[in-house]
Amino acid sequence: RHPIDVRFIEFMPMGEGTRWSDSCFWSAPDILDAVKGLVAVAPVEQEQRNGGPARLYTLSGPDGPGLGRLGLISPLSSHFCTSCNRLRITSDGALRTCLFDDREYRLRNALRHPKLGIEAVRRIVTLATRDKPIGARLLERRHNAVAQRRMTAIGG
């Protein structure tokens, strides 16, 4: 009855000491296959997506098409690094250009400094986006954490 989007996010190996195994990993294609066993699934056209990392699908059941959509975010099985357009600012004022890269750019001091202002922030963001990694080499680092900070410390 309501247009609710539901997203499934594959396991993201984040945080110091994270270890994982293929036997405990449920991939986005496996999730999609399970959903296809229940309802009809159709991909959402690119121009109707919100620009995020999720691959979106409409669902139709015996009562007709659903109002919401299914989104699958697949950092491991079908990584989205080359199309990523995201930046994150952590709660302690650091800019991160990639969840899976530990490089951070300090924004807090520039934001708080009365004389630096928006131009200093703009320079930092420009530098950070110029250095944004194209791919995080997730599969090369399999079974180990790819970033030291946990998602709860990064935000997202």
Each predicted region: which residue ranges?
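Radical SAM enzyme [4Fe-4S]-AdoMet core and its adjacent flexible, acidic
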Residues: 1-70, 75, 109
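Radical SAM enzyme core and accessory elements
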Residues: 65, 78-156
